[in-house]
Structure formats: structure tokens, C-alpha cells
UniProtKB/Swiss-Prot annotation:
The keyword Acyltransferase applies. Its EC number is 2.3.1.181. The keyword Secreted does not apply. One of its GO terms (molecular function) is lipoyl(octanoyl) transferase activity. Its main location: cytoplasm. InterPro entries: aa-tRNA-synth_II/BPL/LPL, BPL_LPL_catalytic, Octanoyltransferase, Octanoyltransferase_CS. It catalyses: octanoyl-[ACP] + L-lysyl-[protein] = N(6)-octanoyl-L-lysyl-[protein] + holo-[ACP] + H(+). The record marks 140 as: Lowers pKa of active site Cys. It comes from Trichodesmium erythraeum (strain IMS101). CDD domains: LipB. This is Octanoyltransferase. The active site is at residue 174.
Length: 221
């Protein structure tokens, strides 16, 4: 695997619509100029629900026409998910031509990043055959949904560090009704996203074989 430079951007709590526009802009830039460096954005979102491109409204437990909760339908695969403070979200903008042009491989790599982070805390992250994500003692703590166009990735993963899980009760998360959602805080009550963020960054660098270079938000504009 070729060692790549990857710019790390950590903008903190960011509106979903703003981060979504950042991703689309970064992807377009790399379509125009494939030599640009890869990017990893690590952040948190205020409360928001997102639907994958082909997601079913049946998995919502609220009326989307009432505008009670912020809701976006986006380009990623998968069903409905929920973002909120306390959940660490990662958006890798990678050119898979520099890695492997294999979506299955990419999804497993993202899972491996989260599994390695859990292992640091002595927690055993698990995969389930036929499903995408990471579970901890039967509770889903890591969700993954991606979009890849011309081998440039966007969207990514969400790790439940210490979120208020109440928001997940308004949906069938990822369309999986027989498995519950959990968080790292259920096992390590004092854990914070500030503590976990650098661990996710380091695990990402190891799994993908990249050199992370912390960048300012300026490259997003």
C-alpha cells in the first residue's frame, strides 16, 4: 500500500448541512484534480437525522412532514441514522485508486479503525456477517455509510462515544430492528469525544497507512 499524506481537519461541532457541503466541494475538487491530498474530517453534529439515498421512510417513527426534527436525504448508502453531540463522526475523502478499488475492502477498513479504537479501552468490537458496522456486546456503537464516485469517497462513519441515545428511539437505526444501539460511555462512563478523537485519527492512519497532517478549516472554503 502506498503511503499517502492525509489532511486532518477537526472543526468541532458543525451543522450537518455545512459539513455535507464541505464534503461535496472536496470531492468535486478531487474529481477536477486527482493529485490533491486525501482528507479526514473528524467532528460532531447537533441533533440531526439522515436518510441514505434509497432509505425507506418506514424506519422513521415521526412524521417527516411536520419539520419537528432536522432531516436530510443524502447520497450515502444505508437507511436512517442519527447524529448528535457525543458521537464522533468521520468523513474520509479518499482517492481509492491510491489504496484498493474495492468497496467491500473499504468498508471493512473503516470497521477496523473503530475496532482498533475500542481495543485501546479493552473493549471487543465485533462485526456481524452481512451487516456493516461495529457492535459491542450486541449493541451497535459504530455506524458506516459511504458514497464513492469515480473512486473518491465521501460520508463515512459515526462512533457513539457518549451521546444521549434517546434520539435513536425515534427511528429504526440503519433499518435493523432486532439489535440495539449502544455507546462507549455505557462501558466507560467518563469517556469523552475529546479523548477519543486523537485515537480515531491514529487508528485511521495505521489502518490506511497514511501520514496525517493537521490542517486548518481554510482548505474547506
Amino acid at each position: 500500500m502506498t503511503s499517502q499524506t492525509c489532511q486532518l481537519i477537526c472543526p468541532g461541532l458543525t451543522k450537518y448541512s455545512v459539513a455535507w457541503e464541505w464534503q461535496r466541494s472536496l470531492v468535486q475538487q478531487r474529481h477536477n484534480c486527482p493529485e490533491l491530498a486525501d482528507v479526514l474530517i473528524l467532528l460532531e453534529h447537533p441533533q440531526v437525522y439522515t436518510l441514505g439515498q434509497g432509505a425507506k421512510l418506514d424506519f422513521l417513527k415521526f412524521d417527516p412532514t411536520q419539520n419537528k426534527y432536522e432531516l436530510h436525504r443524502v447520497e450515502r448508502g444505508g437507511e436512517v441514522t442519527y447524529h448528535c453531540p457525543g458521537q464522533l463522526v468521520g468523513y474520509p475523502i479518499l482517492n481509492l485508486k491510491h489504496y484498493q478499488q474495492d468497496l467491500h475492502w473499504y468498508l471493512r477498513q473503516l470497521e477496523e479503525v473503530l475496532i482498533k479504537v475500542l481495543d485501546i479501552f479493552g473493549l471487543k468490537g465485533e462485526r456481524y456477517p452481512g451487516l456493516t458496522g461495529v457492535w459491542l456486546e450486541g449493541r451497535k456503537v459504530g455506524a458506516i455509510g459511504i458514497k464513492v464516485s469515480r473512486w473518491i469517497t465521501m460520508h463515512g462513519f459515526a462512533l457513539n462515544v457518549s451521546p444521549n441515545l434517546e434520539g435513536f428511539q425515534r427511528i429504526v437505526p440503519c433499518g435493523i430492528s432486532d439489535k440495539s444501539v449502544g455507546s462507549l460511555a455505557q462501558f466507560i462512563p467518563s469517556i469523552t469525544t475529546d479523548e477519543v478523537l486523537p485515537l480515531v485519527a491514529n487508528a485511521f492512519a495505521k489502518v490506511f497507512g497514511v501520514k496525517l497532517v493537521k490542517s486548518t478549516n481554510a482548505i474547506l472554503f
